[in-house]
């Protein structure tokens, strides 16, 4: 997992992520290439609103690999991609938005299963009256998920 927030990387480890890379501290392309003995990853999912991350993602994939742009960037923001690299390395590029009914069902089943420890995502529990604090914590990256209780003070 590649992230710029150390708290999120630490949380990812709790869910069994094998490798974490803070892209503020090291070049993510070099790090992925090193982890894969120079080959690149089979699949790369860019799930963030960064055009830079999208541009970097293609260089993390192996020849004939798959790159998925899951997180949308700001409206009007354009990502510059090296289409020569994409073409000559036979990369498959997909954009993904939303989900179908089967994906929703599988997600629901996972979320309620004993295998998925959803409470690990919850970093803050606040009363509804502190909604602005919850938003600030999330925007600043200090919170993973905030739960708001409507009847608490």
Model features per residue range: what roles?
Residues 55-59, 101-153:
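C-terminal hydrophobic helical "lid"/dimerization subdomain
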Residues 5, 73, 99:
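Residues in the short beta-alpha loop(s) of Rossmann-like NAD(P)-binding domains
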Residues 50-51, 73-75, 153:
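Short glycine-rich anion-binding loops that position phosphate/pyrophosphate groups of nucleotides
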Residues 1-56:
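Adenosine-nucleotide cofactor-binding segment
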Residues 61-63:
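Helix-to-beta-strand junctions that scaffold the AdoMet/dcAdoMet cofactor pocket
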Residues 65-66, 144:
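Glycine-centered, small-residue-biased loops immediately flanking beta-strands
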Residues 72-90, 104-109:
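Rossmann-fold NAD(P)-binding glycine/threonine-rich loop
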């Amino acid at each position: 997992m590649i992230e710029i927030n150390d708290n999120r990387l630490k949380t990812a480890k709790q869910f069994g992520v094998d490798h974490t890379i803070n892209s503020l501290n090291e070049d993510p392309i070099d790090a992925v290439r090193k982890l894969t003995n120079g080959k690149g990853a089979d699949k790369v999912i860019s799930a963030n609103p960064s055009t830079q991350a999208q541009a970097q993602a293609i260089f993390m994939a192996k020849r004939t690999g798959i790159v998925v742009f899951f997180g949308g960037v700001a409206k009007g923001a354009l990502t510059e991609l090296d289409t020569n690299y994409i073409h000559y390395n036979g990369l498959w590029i997909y954009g993904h938005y939303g989900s179908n009914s089967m994906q929703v069902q599988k997600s629901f089943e996972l979320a309620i299963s004993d295998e998925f420890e959803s409470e690990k995502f919850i970093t803050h529990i606040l009363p509804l009256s502190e909604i602005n604090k919850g938003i600030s914590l999330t925007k600043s990256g200090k919170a993973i998920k905030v739960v708001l209780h409507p009847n608490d003070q």
